[in-house]
Amino acid sequence: MQFFAKQNCQVNLLTNNPSSNPRFIMEINSAATLTLVSLLTLPILLALLTRKSSSKKRRPPGPWNLPLVGGLLHLLRSHPQVALRELASKYGPVMFLRMGQIDTVVVSSPAAAQEVLRDKDVMFASRPSLLVSEIFCYDNLDVGFAPYGAYWRMLRKLCTVELLSTKVVRQLAPVRNDETLTLVRNIKAASSGHGGGGGKKPVTLARLLTTCTNTITAKAAFGQACGVELQEQFLTALDVGLKFSGGFCFGDLFPSLRFIDAMTGLRSRLWRARGQLDSVFDKIIAQCEEHQGDSLVNVLLRIRDQGDLEFPFGTTNIKAIILDMFTGGTETTSSAAEWVMSELMRNPEVMAKVQAEVRRVFDNKSPQDHEGLIDNLRYMKMVIKETMRLNPVLPLLMPHLCRETCDIGGYEVVEGTRVVINSWAMARSPEYWDDAEEFKPERFEDGMADYKGSRFEYLPFGTGRRRCPGDTFGMVLLELIVARLLYYFDWSLPAGMQPDDVDMDFVVTATTRRKNHLQLVASPYKLAPIQI
C-alpha cells in the first residue's frame, strides 16, 4: 500500500507541475502540431473525399469486381455479348465493368449508343491499342484501329473518295458479275455426284463463299485474282488475326503483364501471321508496281510516290489499308451470306417467298442485268436485314476509347475508359422489337431501318465517324451473292434433316461465324441453265 501511495504522490506532483516534465511538454507540442496540420489538411481531405464520393455516385452501376481479375468471371458463363446482355438486364443499359485492369463501360440501349456514336462521337472517336492491332494491323496504321486524329481523317478520306466511293463500287460491277457466276458454277460442280443413300452430294458453302469474296476483293484491290497459294496463305494468316482481335487477349486486359503473351507464344503466333501477310502483300505490291493500272493498290502507290500528304505514307501504310479491305471484303461478306442461307433453311415459308420474288424478277433476264435489278428485290433485302439483326457479323462493335471525361446516360465516363457497344443485345431486345427472337423479315417493311445507323437499335456496321467505310462495297456484293444463290438453285437439307435440325451455334472472334459450316443440297433451277 505504501508503494502505491508513493507512486500516486509522484504522479500528482508531476501533474501539478507540468513545467518540470519535459516529456509532457513534448506531448503538448506534438498535439499542437497535429492539430495545426489537421486543420490545414482537413479542407483538402474533405474535397478529395467529396470528389471521390461524387465520382462513385456518378459512375455507372455494375456487378462486383474481384481484385486483379476485375469482373472477367462474369464473362465465362457464355459468349461475351450474351453474358453482357444478362448483366445489363440487372444493372442497366450503361454498365461499368472492370475487365482485368481495364475500366470498361458497356452500352446496351439505343439512347446511350446514340450519345456515344452521334451526340458525343468526337469524344469516343478513338480506339484502344490492342496486341493484334499493334502486330497484325501494322501498328495501328489501318483505318479500323488508327487513333482518332489527322492521320485517321486522311485514311478515311482516302477510303471514301478514292477507294470505296459509290463510283468505284459501281465500276466493279463486271468483277462481281463474273465471280458470282463462277461461284454458281463451282457450287454445281461441287454438288455433282451422289451422297450417301443415293441422294445428291451436300455442298459446304463456307469455303466456296470465302473463295468468291476473296477473289472479288483481290480483283478490286489490284486488278487480278490471287493465285491459289497466295490465297491460302492469306486466309490462314487472317484466321489467326481474327481469332485474337476481339480485345480479350491477356495483354489487352492486363497491360502491365503483357510479357505473358510472349511466354504463351501468342506474340510469336501473331508475328508469324504478320510475316505471312507481308509475303502476300509484297508480291501484290510488286505486281502492281510492274503493271500500272487503275486498281486500288495502284491508286495507293501513286499517292505514296507523289508524297503530297502531310504524314509519312509508305509501303507499310499501304499494307495496313489492303488488310482492312481484304478482311471486310472476304470475312464479313462470306459469313453474312452463310447466315442468310442458315435462316432460310430454318424458315421454309420465307425461303419459298423470297425465292419466288427473285425468280420473278430475274427470269428471262441476262445475267449481266441481275445486279441492276437488285433494287426490285424488296423482300430479299428484308431477309438480309433480318438475318443481320439476329446474326450481326459484329455483335460487339469495335471498342471505342473515351478521349475526354463526359457523361453517358447521366453517368460519368472517365477519360481513358474503354466503351463497348453491345449491338447484338439491342437487336434482340423485346423492348425495341416485337417477337425479338423470331425470324420475321416483314418487320423491315416500313423501310425505317437501314445499314447506316438510322435506328440505333440496329447497327450491323456501326455508325458515326468510325462506321465501317466499306459497308456499301460489302452490301452490294452480299445482295448479289444471295440473289444468285436463290435464283440458280433449289436448296434442301441433307437426307434425314428437318428445318429445326439446323443448328445456329456460333463462335466469336472479331466477327461471328457459324460454329459448324452449313451443308446443303443444291439442285439447279431448270429455267436458269448454268454453263460450266
Curated annotation (Swiss-Prot):
Keywords: Heme, Iron, Membrane, Metal-binding, Monooxygenase, Oxidoreductase, Plant defense, Transmembrane, Transmembrane helix. Its main location: membrane. SUPFAM superfamilies: Cytochrome P450. It is found in: Membrane. Its EC number is 1.14.-.-. InterPro entries: Cyt_P450 (IPR001128), Cyt_P450_CS (IPR017972), Cyt_P450_E_grp-I (IPR002401), Cyt_P450_sf (IPR036396). PROSITE patterns: CYTOCHROME_P450 (PS00086). Pfam families: p450. Heme binds at residue 468. It is a multi-pass membrane protein. The keyword Transport does not apply. GO terms for biological process: defense response. One of its GO terms (molecular function) is iron ion binding. The chain crosses the membrane at residues 30-50, 473-493. GO terms for cellular component: membrane. 3-beta-hydroxy-9-beta-pimara-7,15-dien-19,6-beta-olide is a precursor of the phytoalexins momilactones A and B. Phytoalexins are diterpenoid secondary metabolites involved in the defense mechanism of the plant and produced in response to attack (by a pathogen, elicitor or UV irradiation). Momilactone B can also act as an allochemical (an antimicrobial and allelopathic agent), being constitutively produced in the root of the plant and secreted to the rhizosphere where it suppresses the growth of neighboring plants and soil microorganisms. Involved in momilactone phytoalexins biosynthesis. Participates in the biosynthetic steps between 9-beta-pimara-7,15-diene and 3-beta-hydroxy-9-beta-pimara-7,15-dien-19,6-beta-olide. This is Cytochrome P450 99A2. The lineage of its organism: Eukaryota, Viridiplantae, Streptophyta, Embryophyta, Tracheophyta. The gene is CYP99A2.
